[in-house]
Amino acid sequence: VAWTKYMAEKKPWRLALLASRVFGVDSYNYNETERAYILSEKLSAFFKKLHLPTTLAELKIDNKDFDAMAARAVRNGNVGHYVPLDATAIKDILTLAL
């Protein structure tokens, strides 16, 4: 869910397409960025319906190790193909996940 929030500002078009195709979000009433954020809300609601945690706080994970986690994630270079993520971006996503 946090990743979709982060990507909503970076490259919303694919998320917007997913929101329209999977959740029926109307492309005439919402722009791409709005639909990307709606996708995040819809995914969160779906996961909650399945009784799955949607935040790190629900898993009792705080931000004290975010720097180490981000550094470990990119120790072999940036991750991701849609939008390459460096340590700063990963830390931002982890922060959104709180």
Regions found by a protein language model. Name each.
Residues A2-D65:
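Gly/Pro-rich interdomain helix-loop hinge
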Residues D62-L98:
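Short, amphipathic C-terminal "tail helix"
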